[in-house]
UniProtKB/Swiss-Prot annotation:
GO terms for molecular function: double-stranded RNA binding; ribonuclease III activity. Residues 31-57, 66-85 are annotated as: Disordered. SUPFAM superfamilies: RNase III domain-like (SSF69065). It comes from Oryza sativa subsp. japonica (Rice). This is Ribonuclease III domain-containing protein RNC1, chloroplastic. Residues 69-82 have a biased composition (Basic residues). The keyword ATP-binding does not apply. Keywords: Chloroplast, mRNA processing, mRNA splicing, Plastid, Repeat, Ribonucleoprotein, RNA-binding, Transit peptide.
Length: 533
């Protein structure tokens, strides 16, 4: 008998006594694919009957088409980033000679806002279809503007109104090929770039004369409520122009981000065109007649604030009644007037400023300031007394430009530079915009707006005044003088305000040409003059 260990070994090496059924040892193999010939079958002949949708041959043919190697499409850069070779001299000369922008020598600003290329057939088609509707809504005669003026007199600005009015309505629409052409796109953007500053100056002059005792803060609120971007679509619809701006959309159902930018661009460009062709009086007529704006409407009133008591006199022409837009638009200064804009000067410089005549500042600092600014300018007056009176008023206006609000504003709210600063800020914006338009004929409006913003930054305005060492003559209140003179966070805005007030005074006394002289010759805003070593 074998030992137990050997018995266990024999048991372990032997087969199991329980046989498994043969059916369970089979493995089930499932067919997951069908082997097929990968060569595509020939296409069916036209005479053969159409194959059903689930035909194997049709499915194999489509699979073979999908398996074909397709090279990936190369991603080309956008067209605006593709560098083009410069034009040769002959083509460049031809382009400039055929450009309408160089066709008017007598009207350089209007000429610079004309399209950079002649209008195409698509442009003329739009003008034939829709221009009469726009002119009727704005209150203009329906005859073509080319018939205005004497004969072939291109010096008449109104002759170019049809072209500029067409450009004003061509806001950029990505689905419209006509508005994406270069001469239309740039022409429209250049018009809205000019028009925004025209509107700001128009309302500034109007409100300064309508509210002779009010500070500029409430006036800015009125302007924003009237022509802010939220209110502009309402005015577009009030003038029945919404079908021209949004021909395929319902203005009331559009969301804000789709409705406001095109309406704002068309509104600004419209007043740029009107200003170029007819001047500022026509801007007032279209604002208050065609669009129906009401400065006394409840929606555009400034918020209530604590008002300082104004005990000083205003000029006689403002005491009788409140001026209307017709008074401002129809006003023409008399031939022997002291100033270029007499009523605007009276609205900004109170009559009580004569009490400061002959004080220490007038005796010590006024001659130095006038010498730096090149005042008084030579004028051809019939009567010498007119020249003398103008120079006296100019000296008082200069003293008001340097009169900081901390000095007298609490007791006498208008004995400070705020109202002159308001008009100066708007006129310097417009003068710089006109300068950039005439200087950069090819530039679109967005590029000009960025250039304009960089040239007129507040820190630069004050710096130009400090470069002329005029900030030493600012009259501060005794309690804050040390802080303003030694803290640049306080000093820089105050010098900027004085700079803008000087521009406002120059506009009131001598007109827009003197603002250009101060900005580009005296203060050198463009920084192109050589620096003293």
């Amino acid at each position: 008998m074998a030992p137990p260990a050997m018995a266990f070994q024999a048991l372990a090496l032997g087969p199991l006594p329980l046989p498994l059924p043969a059916a369970r040892r089979r493995r089930r193999v499932r067919v997951l694919a069908v082997a097929a010939d990968h060569t595509p079958p020939p296409p069916p002949s036209p005479s053969s009957p159409p194959e059903p949708a689930n035909s194997p041959s049709r499915l194999l043919r489509e699979l073979a088409e999908r398996k074909k190697a397709v090279s990936p499409k190369k991603k080309h850069p956008p067209r605006r980033f593709i560098l083009k070779p410069p034009l040769d001299d002959e083509r460049l000369t031809q382009r400039f000679l055929s450009s309408p922008q160089l066709s008017l020598k007598a009207l350089p600003l209007l000429s610079s806002c004309l399209p950079s290329a002649p209008l195409s057939a698509a442009d003329r088609t739009w003008m034939d279809e829709y221009l009469l509707e726009a002119k009727q809504a704005l209150g203009y005669p329906l005859a073509p503007s080319e018939t205005l003026g004497d004969g072939d007199d291109d010096g008449c600005p109104a002759r170019h109104f049809d072209v500029l009015l067409y450009l004003a309505f061509q806001h950029l629409d990505t689905s419209c090929e006509r508005t994406r052409t270069r001469h239309v796109r740039s022409g429209h953007s250049r018009l809205w770039f000019l028009g925004q500053y025209v509107l700001e100056l128009a309302f500034c002059e109007f409100f300064l004369q309508r509210y002779p005792r009010e500070s500029p803060g409430p006036m800015r609120e009125r302007v924003f409520a009237l022509i802010g971007k939220r209110a502009i679509p309402k005015w577009i619809k009030a003038a029945s122009l919404h079908n021209l701006v949004f021909p395929y959309d319902d203005l009331d159902k559009m969301i804000r981000k789709d409705r406001e930018p095109p309406a704002k661009a068309v509104f600004w460009a419209l007043f740029g065109a009107i200003y170029l062709c007819f001047g500022m009086p026509e801007v007032y007529r279209v604002l208050f007649e065609a669009f129906g704006m009401d400065p006394e409407d409840e929606s555009c009133q400034p918020k209530l604030r604590r008002q300082l008591e104004d005990v000083d006199y205003v000029s006689v022409e403002f005491e009788k009644r409140q001026l209307t837009w017709q008074d401002v638009a129809a006003y023409r200064p008399p031939p022997d007037a002291l100033f270029a804009h007499p009523r605007l000067f009276r609205a900004c410089v109170p009559p009580g400023m004569h009490r400061f005549r002959g004080n220490i500042w007038d005796f010590d600092n006024r001659p130095k300031v006038m010498n730096t600014l090149g005042y008084p300018l030579p004028m051809n007056d019939r009567i010498p007394e007119i020249t003398e009176a103008r120079n006296i008023e100019l000296g008082l206006g200069l003293q008001l430009c340097f009169l900081h609000p901390s000095k007298h504003k609490f007791e006498h709210p208008r004995f400070c530079l705020e109202r002159l600063e308001y008009v100066g800020q708007k006129i310097q914006d417009l003068v710089m915009a006109e300068r950039l338009l005439m200087k950069h004929l090819d530039a679109p409006g967005r590029w000009l707006a960025e250039k304009h913003r960089r040239l007129l930054m507040n820190k630069y305005c004050g710096r130009y005044l400090r470069d002329k060492h005029l900030h030493h003559y600012i009259i501060y209140g005794e309690s804050v003088q040390d802080r303003f003179e030694h803290n640049r966070r306080l000093r820089n805005p105050s010098t900027t305000a004085v700079q803008q007030a000087i521009h406002g005074l120059a506009y009131c006394v001598y007109g827009k040409p003197d603002v250009r002289r101060l900005m580009f010759e005296v203060f050198d805003f463009e920084q192109v003059q050589p620096k003293a070593v």
